[in-house]
Amino acid sequence: MQLKRVAEAKLPTPWGDFLMVGFEELATGHDHVALVYGDISGQTPVLARVHSECLTGDALFSLRCDCGFQLEAALTHIAEEGRGILLYHRQEGRNIGLLNKIRAYALQDQGYDTVEANHQLGFAADERDFTLCADMFKLLGVDEVRLLTNNPKKVEILTEAGINIVERVPLIVGRNPNNEHYLDTKAAKMGHLLGK
């Protein structure tokens, strides 16, 4: 186990009241959070989203990506379902960090795509570690999920880490003229399933 569960509190939102559960990485002290809606116990697979931190999309309403749109849609789906989990995975910019993400944006402004920009900065296309999310699910007592994602690699990694993904639920929202090239690159170079 790479994490420990350290704190929890009620979080009222426009979608209803969630239980916010805080986790800490044992090796680094980095924190992550889960938003739990309703009763997630029992044998029925839980609707869940692993949402990687995106300050620009989630908090600053950037149209360069689909992250903020996906966050809102995931919370809506979970609330409509009556139960579910959103793991907020604190690995900004596919885990290159905020400042490097800004540098990658500058390279994209010069014509590089999102993958090429990461490579120019010395990073892989995706530096995230989703095994942390498997540990969060386990610490919440969940081992079967219906995963809201367009990323088959996320399904593969979570499955290898012991989480039974019984269904991949598409989450295709937020396409706009500012992020079309970004989304097309994620589909073509990273295998994301983003049918237009």
Curated annotation (Swiss-Prot):
Reaction equation(s) it catalyzes: GTP + 4 H2O = 2,5-diamino-6-hydroxy-4-(5-phosphoribosylamino)-pyrimidine + formate + 2 phosphate + 3 H(+)
EC number(s) recorded for this UniProt protein: 3.5.4.25
Residue sites binding Zn(2+) per the record: 54, 65, 67
Cofactor comment: Binds 1 zinc ion per subunit.
Binding residue positions for GTP: 49-53, 70, 92-94, 114, 149, 154
One term of GO molecular function: zinc ion binding
InterPro entries xref list: GTP_cyclohydro_II, RibA, RibA-like_sf
Cofactor: Zn(2+)
Gene3D superfamilies: GTP cyclohydrolase II (3.40.50.10990)
Coiled-coil segments on the chain, per record: none
The keyword Chloroplast appears for this protein: no
Record pathway: Cofactor biosynthesis; riboflavin biosynthesis; 5-amino-6-(D-ribitylamino)uracil from GTP: step 1/4
Active site: 126 (proton acceptor), 128 (nucleophile)
Biological process, per Gene Ontology: riboflavin biosynthetic process
Keywords for this protein: GTP-binding, Hydrolase, Metal-binding, Nucleotide-binding, Riboflavin biosynthesis, Zinc
An example Gene Ontology CC term for this record: cytosol
A Pfam cross-reference name: GTP_cyclohydro2
Catalytic class of the enzyme: hydrolase
Transmembrane segments: none
Protein role: Catalyzes the conversion of GTP to 2,5-diamino-6-ribosylamino-4(3H)-pyrimidinone 5'-phosphate (DARP), formate and pyrophosphate.
Record text on subunit structure and interactions: Homodimer.
NCBIfam families membership: PRK00393.1, ribA
Protein family according to the UniProt entry: Belongs to the GTP cyclohydrolase II family.
Protein's name according to its UniProt entry: GTP cyclohydrolase-2
